[in-house]
A protein has these predicted regions:
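Short, conserved catalytic/metal-binding motifs centered on acidic residues
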Residues: 56, 99-109, 138, 200-209, ...
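Short amphipathic alpha-helical "interface-anchor" segments enriched in bulky aromatics
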Residues: 332-366
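Domain-level cores of phosphate- or acyl-group-handling catalytic modules
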Residues: 169-241
Length: 409
């Protein structure tokens, strides 16, 4: 990097950003790769508006060739993103306790059909089918904030099977088509291998995944605690309970949909949850809960019939109204602990909003598979670098909303 391509100053951020870049990207074999990683990070942190490669380069250096070099680094340079993600994971874990591993979903709208993994898909936010990429991120929930540390891109079968498409997008031979459920499990498996702290509960929105039943069975058999929202149409059966335990009345073993069971409100002792905080008006929610079994989660092996807790929120006078239905294998946990984990899912959704608005989540313009992963890795690093100091500062100044949960009389 010549004097003309040296990054513009970041004032007090300079030294710490240098150290941060060296820690995460020190594995890159060439010095110029490490320098361009630093330029990209600085650009993400300082460039207002759209985070195109051209704008990132222009905000950091006056070099007329910087944009081309940065484009080469992101889209064509064959560097491995996994070591950087593992180091980012360790960097975050060293600085803050992790409350949950949260799975977030992201839709990346695209105009053309040449970006890797592009396909037609229904986007709930848009309310219609869109041309897009679709991916999952694993977030570390830190209590007040969630930080992404790993990503997976859905590769539809046509992209996986067509050698021309694979070659054009530079898809590695070991990358195959995987279902959304398999990608979620892959993220959790990778996290379990690389984390340096105790395993945290998995929190995820599986409400639009057709294979949610088998997936929760696989999570349980891998030894993970989990709390996930499930499709209302998922078949469950009441597990039954001793009288007075507050479980749904009805015939144990009879199959019913999760949504119907949650909407029935047939609970002897419902919970009342009070959501309160320094900046929010308290909200009172009724929580209906029951023990269930999930036929689709069973492995078929003897002794594998597991019991789960299913619950949903009921606003007074309004019923469930199609709200989320949650299920967990943490049947012995207090309801207030479970509702605290529900909030972690909302935190990852807020993080996705911030990544979109401030860190260029949807701004990657390249078409290659490695380029997508390079951008997502650097974007996650920039977000963590900015977010963790802000979280510590905020936690020092004010508390966070708490859920007071008690059984109603």
């Amino acid at each position: 990097m010549t004097a003309h391509t040296r990054p513009r100053a970041l004032a007090a951020m300079d030294t710490t950003l240098d150290d941060f870049t060296e820690r995460l990207f020190g594995h890159l074999p060439r010095a110029d790769q490490r320098r361009w990683a630093r330029v990209y990070l600085q650009g993400l942190l300082t460039t207002p508006g759209k985070k195109s490669v051209r704008r990132l380069a222009a905000s950091v250096t006056a070099s007329p060739t910087a944009s081309q070099s940065l484009q080469q680094f992101i889209n064509a340079s064959p560097w491995d993103w996994d070591p950087a993600r593992r180091e980012l994971l360790r960097w975050v874990e060293e600085r803050h306790p992790v409350h949950a591993w949260t799975i977030g979903q992201a839709v990346f709208p695209k105009r053309g059909e040449h970006s890797v993994g592009v396909h037609r898909r229904f986007d709930p936010a848009a309310g219609r089918a869109v041309n897009c990429q679709f991916g999952f991120g694993l977030f570390l929930s830190l209590g007040g904030m969630s930080v992404p540390v790993d990503w997976r891109l859905l590769l539809p079968e046509p992209w996986a099977a067509d050698p021309v498409l694979r070659g054009r997008a530079r898809i590695s031979p070991d990358v195959a088509h995987r279902t959304p459920e398999a990608l979620v499990l892959e993220l959790v498996d990778a996290m379990a291998v690389h984390t340096s702290s105790a395993h945290a509960p998995v929190v995820a929105d599986l409400s639009r995944l057709s294979g949610a039943g088998p997936l929760i069975g696989l999570l349980g058999r891998r030894g993970h605690d989990f709390l996930v929202s499930i499709p209302p149409a998922l078949a469950v059966s009441a597990a039954g309970a001793a009288p007075g335990r507050g479980e749904p009345a009805g015939a144990p073993g009879r199959e019913i949909t999760a949504g119907d069971l949650a909407r029935s409100g047939n609970t002897r002792h419902p919970y009342t949850a009070l959501l309160a905080g320094p900046a929010a008006r308290p909200q009172r929610l009724r929580i209906d809960s029951g023990l269930v079994r999930v036929p689709g989660a069973e492995s078929g092996a003897p002794g594998t019939r597991r019991t789960y807790r299913l619950f949903g929120e009921r606003h007074p006078g309004a019923g469930h109204g199609g709200g989320p239905v949650w299920i967990t294998n943490m049947t012995g946990h207090r309801m207030d602990d479970l509702l605290h984990l529900v909030r972690q899912s909302a935190e990852s959704a807020r993080a996705l909003g911030s990544l979109t608005e401030d860190f260029g989540l949807l701004d990657f313009e390249g078409r290659s598979f490695p380029g997508w992963h390079h951008h997502m890795t650097l974007m996650s690093a920039a977000y963590a670098y900015r977010a963790l100091p802000a979280l510590r500062d905020r936690q020092g100044r004010q508390g966070y909303p708490v859920l007071e949960v008690r059984q109603s009389a």
